A protein has these predicted regions:
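Aromatic-residue-lined binding/catalytic grooves and analogous aromatic/hydrophobic interfacial grooves
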Residues: 1-231
Length: 231
């Protein structure tokens, strides 16, 4: 089961295997500049996984270990030399974690939380000097990603989630749309709703959902200090 909560800007994946219920929660915090992923289950010691990063095929870079539980990928695009850095750190409850050959291997953990930060050295220069090869070169992504990651890990999952929700909800909850409060369509999956809608079945809730989905996308893709949504 895959869920996207528009109210909290969180993605959730739920599945069962060998009578164990697994859940994976994902959110990206704008205030903290971090992607957070929590893998949990309804029984202890069931987190067995390997985490690795697939590099961009149009860039050249290297992966190095960062301590016992982290990875750092530093690279530059082949066409314009723009530098970027991706950092990953895993925090586990129970079990073991091995950091080897660019992979984080977790065995027998109760829970795993991954923190991911990424940045480039691109600078939005609105008065560029095209004779200067560094006119669009800004911050050092090694430094920014390192600071963001350290801050995120220090805060921990619960504090980051609360900060993320407060930041997002302050924008998302400003608008409510209710086209027909007397019509209820139950908890049909969105895919089934779309099929019914194409066949001419009215679904006011689906129209409300798509309106709010558009707002979610805009809030998630364009904030002060960042690029506009179309970029």
């Amino acid at each position: 089961k895959r869920i996207l909560s528009l109210d909290s800007a969180m993605a959730v994946v739920q599945f069962k295997k060998d009578d164990v219920a697994y859940q994976r929660n994902y959110f990206i915090s704008y205030p903290a500049n971090v992607l957070v992923m929590r893998f949990s289950a309804d029984r202890p010691g069931k987190q067995n996984l390997i985490f690795s990063y697939a590099p961009n095929p149009v860039s050249t870079g290297s992966m190095v270990a960062q301590g016992d539980n982290g990875l750092v990928y530093s690279a530059a695009l082949d066409n314009n030399g723009m530098k970027y850095v991706v950092r990953i750190q895993a925090e586990t409850k129970g079990g073991t974690l091995v950091n080897r050959n660019g992979k984080l291997t977790v065995k027998g953990a109760d829970e795993v939380v991954f923190y991911v930060t990424a940045d480039t050295d691109y600078k939005a220069n609105f008065a560029p000097d095209f004779k200067n090869p560094k006119t669009y070169v800004g911050v050092n992504p090694v430094e920014t990603t390192g600071q963001w990651l350290a801050n995120a890990v220090a805060k921990g999952y619960s504090a980051l989630l609360n900060e993320h929700y407060q930041d997002y909800a302050a924008l998302f909850n400003r608008v409510k749309l209710n086209l027909n409060p007397t019509v209820k369509t139950g908890n049909l999956p969105t895919g089934q709703r779309l099929k019914n809608y194409r066949k001419g079945q009215p679904d006011y809730y689906l129209e409300e959902l798509y309106f709010q989905f558009g707002r979610y996308l805009l809030i998630a893709s364009s904030r002060p200090g960042n690029m506009p949504a179309n970029l």
